[in-house]
Amino acid sequence: MSYGKKLTNAELIAFLNANRHGILAFAGRTPYALPMGYIYREKTLLLCLTDEGKKMERLKKNKTVCYTICKTRWETEGLKTPCTSAVIEGKLEAVKDKSVYGLGAKKFENMTLYKLAIAEMGARKCIRKPCELFANKSGATVKARGKKKG
């Protein structure tokens, strides 16, 4: 049984524009992933990375990455919006001309702007109503933590 429905292209673009963070995972002998903000412009994901650390060591060896964006029911009022996610695979490439993306000549100290050259992308949303995966024994859906009405 499938729990997800593929997003239309319009839904995918709206999802990418509505969110600003995800998890960037690097290829390698051992797993390495970190939370990372992004900007979606001109059918491209843009990421700004510091020029040092483990991610740069990984990137020098292999530019292939996977970026996952997820919005869960827990993040919405009354658990009403379906869980939605996008998984994007490709290679990170340094952006030489930032003006192409309307970013001007901004320069961040010890940081480089990268674009994710998308090789493959998939996006789905949950079709369960309400989310049966988080229902308690009585069948009632568990309320979102930290959310107060009114």
Would you name each region that the model predicts?
Residues 1-18, 134-135, 141:
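Extreme N-terminal tail/first-helix region
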Residues 9, 22, 83-84:
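Hydrophobic small-molecule pocket/channel-lining residues, especially in calycin-type beta-barrels
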Residues 22, 45, 92-93, 121-123:
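Short beta-strand segments in beta-sandwich/barrel cores
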Residues 52-111, 118:
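Short, structured beta-strand-loop surface elements
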Residues 37-41, 91-94, 130:
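A short, sequence-level motif marking secondary-structure junctions
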Residues 19-51, 67:
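Short beta-strand segments
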Residues 98-150:
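C-terminal edge-of-domain segments
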Residues 14-16, 37-39, 57-59:
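Short, conserved, surface-exposed binding loops centered on an aromatic residue
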